[in-house]
């Protein structure tokens, strides 16, 4: 039986504006990664935001396929574009 993880998600900039929150808690299945969390965010908030983000897990830049652990803090950092 898989365990449920509590992941704190922190939003910045455009993502925070779209969602209307600066953070929230997601309950995820053990073995999930940031890509899975992003899919849950898109579904819950009915938004299409792409994947143009850097991510940090527990204040360390990370990869999208890293396995998350209970209590992790996941931050989505929008990439700045312009010229």
PLM segments and residue spans:
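Ubiquitin-like/PB1-type beta-grasp interaction modules and other compact soluble beta-rich domains
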Residues: 1-82
């Amino acid at each position: 039986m898989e365990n449920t993880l509590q992941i704190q998600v922190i939003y910045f900039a455009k993502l925070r504006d779209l969602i209307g929150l600066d953070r929230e808690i997601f309950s995820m299945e053990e073995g999930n990664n940031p890509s899975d969390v992003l899919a849950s965010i898109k579904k819950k908030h009915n938004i299409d935001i792409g994947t143009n983000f850097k991510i940090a897990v527990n204040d360390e830049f990370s990869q999208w396929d890293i396995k998350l652990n209970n209590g992790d803090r996941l931050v989505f950092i929008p990439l700045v574009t312009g010229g």
